[in-house]
Curated annotation (Swiss-Prot):
GO terms for molecular function: mRNA binding. Residues 12-28 have a biased composition (Basic and acidic residues). Keywords: Nucleus, Repeat, Ribosome biogenesis, rRNA processing. This is Nucleolar protein 9. Pumilio repeats lie at residues 87-122, 123-158, 187-228, 285-321, 333-368, 370-406, 510-547, 548-586. Residues 1-11 have a biased composition (Basic residues). RNA-binding nucleolar protein required for pre-rRNA processing. Involved in production of 18S rRNA and assembly of small ribosomal subunit. Residues 1-42 are annotated as: Disordered. One of its GO terms (cellular component) is preribosome, small subunit precursor. It is found in: Nucleus, Nucleolus. Belongs to the NOP9 family. The keyword Nucleus applies.
Length: 665
């Protein structure tokens, strides 16, 4: 058969390439995966009316009052919350869709009691999907769901609540929180597919999956929260809207939640695939559309979470099979999809995460078929493929990890130019593999940061980039995130091998004294100085040289937020150097007024036990000896027992008698 060429070959290659739709949300909302239009049932109703001027002003004032939180007692605050909830009755939907009043609703949910929580939950019945799609109301739903999960666990552990059967006035009877939650799930089930890539509802869906699968419910303000968007986390910090103790926890859930999760994901799979059964032949169009979800910036985190939890009840990993093949053969369309994942920021983040919790045999297949032959090339893609390679180093078996290390080590010094995290990952992989090629790793790192041929080598300059940093600035610039990353990396190098500790100290001693002292006052670089003060790893000569510099500014260091930690560390660092310890103590006592007037200085004064230095010097010296012996146990000189003493005395007496006889002769 002749070799294919020309336009037919070009068309075939083009058909096999993966090109995600730019407007995938629009397409997925209007069409099923089999290409047929779907009924328009997922368009949310998000207008529920507006508050009148007086109501709006009242709720604004109550939001400000709760925000200030100046209540004298908890009872007073609880009564205030009760009054506001009563005033808000019947207006809940108007409140949650208002920018200002939605914050009030979140504060009410965070501060209400269990009965009030159920009442608020019931107020949204029939509209959970609608408000989940709203910019402001979706945040209220997330807060409500977290508190509801806490109450579900509470009722599960303590099944009977005499005071939970009715409301305070006896007008309402509430079902268990579990039933209310399941009722809410039935309401949103028909809309699951449209929620996957909805800008706001996707966050609610992820939280629901986390609750049903008993995973950690994330904080809404932490930077690494997996539910809230970056803008939302920043906004909550700015308006001082804090989580309560129900967040950032794992909750025990009833068996019905696991069953509901299974049913929900099965329904979603059926909806996505045109009612195909698991492991059945899937339409290629369905697979392409699902892969578009995998690289969609909104839908991708939802798909990642689904792939993570499906293993709880589905051994066949149906959703994984929608994204990837499971046979050992290379597939042209899958290869195009993998190349897109490895070169796209969203796609690489998706692949990086699913590698960490997918079945090992599935990850090994992807590595063997598509990644193994291009490890170095992918590692040089700083914002995409590099993160996938790092994830493989953390999660693959020993054999594959060693293969990756063998491929990367010759180019490590080049990779570190643009991706310092690679150094950390390789160090950790080396340690995990019983110090595999440790000497080569050290050699490559030294070549990068402390080259032998350089006359001006200084690991502080090469690793921390001191010359272009905020060190010594008089503008009160905050340390940058890049400086923080570099400092942490240098500390990891110091922990990895004594060579890096030695060159770090050597580099500090080669700096101008003023420059080294500036590091001690820096919010980030001070941690590096503190980290080298490891008494058992630094020889006594280097310790003395460092102490000679630090003692010159010891009083100011003790009164500084960052320098005080260094002074505290000097207590141990001066072990077996009592003279230096006494010089530091004398300098601090001589400037006692300045030290005691500083909150940091007072802590140093306490840690150095300077009151005993002044009043009971002998006891202070005794503490020094005990501390030195604890740091260097081999210093202890064992006292001879009684028999040994007698033997020594007899030996000495015999020597004295022999010498006396000789003198007489």
């Amino acid at each position: 058969m002749g070799k294919p060429r020309g336009r037919k070959l070009e068309k075939k290659i083009k058909d096999q390439e993966f090109h995600p739709e730019q407007d995938s949300e629009k397409i997925s909302e209007n069409y099923n995966y089999d290409g047929h239009p779907e009924s328009d049932t997922s368009n949310p109703q998000m207008f529920f009316g507006v508050l009148d001027r007086d109501e709006l002003e009242y709720f604004k004032q109550t939001e400000a009052t709760l925000s200030l939180d100046t209540f004298e007692t908890e009872e007073e605050k609880a009564q205030f919350v009760t009054n506001v909830i009563q005033e808000a009755e019947g207006k809940e939907l108007k409140l949650v869709t208002s920018q200002i009043c939605s914050k009030l609703m979140e504060r009410l949910i965070l501060n209400c009691n269990d009965i009030q929580l159920k009442k608020l939950f019931q107020a949204f019945n029939g509209n959970f999907y609608n408000i989940s799609c709203h910019k402001y109301a979706s945040h209220v739903v997330e807060t409500l769901l977290v508190r509801s999960a806490s109450l579900v666990e509470k009722e599960l552990i303590t099944p009977h609540f005499d005071n939970m059967d009715a409301s305070v006035d006896g007008s309402d009877v509430f079902a268990p929180m579990e039933s209310l939650f399941l009722f809410m799930l039935n309401e949103i089930k028909p809309h699951l597919k449209s929620m996957i890539n909805h800008q706001y509802a996707s966050h609610v869906l992820r939280l629901i999956i986390l609750i049903l699968s008993s995973k950690t419910l994330p904080s809404t303000t932490q930077n690494n929260s997996i539910v809230r968007s970056k803008k939302s986390k920043i906004a909550r910090k700015m308006i001082d809207l804090k989580d309560n103790e129900d967040f950032n926890k794992v909750y025990q859930t009833p068996e019905s939640f696991k069953s509901e999760l299974k049913m929900m994901l099965n329904d979603l799979y059926s909806d996505l695939t045109g009612h195909a059964k698991p492991k059945a032949e899937i339409n290629p169009t369905v697979i392409t559309k699902f892969r578009e979800f995998c690289v969609d910036k909104v839908a991708s985190p939802v798909i990642q979470l689904i792939i993570q939890v499906e293993g709880i009840f589905d051994r066949d990993r149906s959703f994984w099979r929608l994204a990837f093949n499971t046979n050992d053969e290379k597939d042209a369309k899958e290869q195009s999809f993998m190349e897109y994942l490895l070169s796209d920021p969203v796609g690489s983040h998706f692949l990086e995460n699913v590698i960490s919790f997918a079945k090992t045999k599935y990850v090994e297949r992807l590595y063997r078929v598509y990644i193994k032959d291009q490890i170095v090339r992918l590692a040089k893609r700083d914002t995409t493929g590099a993160f996938v390679i790092q994830s493989l180093l953390k999660n693959m078996k020993d054999k594959e990890v060693k293969e990756i290390l063998d491929a990367l080590l010759p180019d490590l010094s080049i990779l570190l130019n643009s991706n310092m995290d690679f150094g950390t990952t390789i160090i950790n992989a080396c340690i995990k593999q019983n110090n595999y090629k440790r000497d080569e790793v050290i050699g490559q790192l030294m070549k990068k940061y402390y080259p032998d041929g350089s006359s001006e080598k200084n690991i502080l300059e090469s690793c921390l980039l001191l010359a272009s940093s905020t060190l010594g600035n008089t503008k009160d610039d905050w340390p940058t995130a890049e400086e923080r990353r570099r400092s942490i990396f240098l500390e990891e190098l110091i922990d990895f091998d004594d060579k890096f500790l030695e060159v770090a100290i050597e580099s500090m001693l080669n700096l101008p004294e003023e420059r080294l002292l500036q590091m001690c006052y820096h919010g980030v670089f001070s941690h590096v100085v503190e980290h080298v003060l490891q008494v058992q790893r630094v020889d006594i000569i280097k310790r003395k040289l460092l102490l000679n510099i630090l003692i010159k500014d010891i009083v100011k260091l003790a009164c500084n937020a960052y320098g005080s930690h260094i002074v505290d560390k000097l207590w141990d660092f001066t072990a077996k150097l009592t003279l230096y310890k006494e010089r530091i103590a004398a300098a601090l006592v001589e400037n006692s007024e300045m030290v005691k007037n500083s909150v940091y200085g007072r802590q140093v004064w306490k840690n150095w036990q300077l009151e005993k230095y002044i009043r009971k010097r002998w006891e202070w010296k005794k503490i020094i000896k005990e501390s030195d012996l604890e740091t260097f146990p081999n210093m202890r000189v064992l006292q001879p027992n009684m028999q040994e003493r007698a033997a020594i005395k007899r030996k000495n007496d015999d020597k004295a008698f022999d010498s006396m006889k000789k003198s007489r002769k």
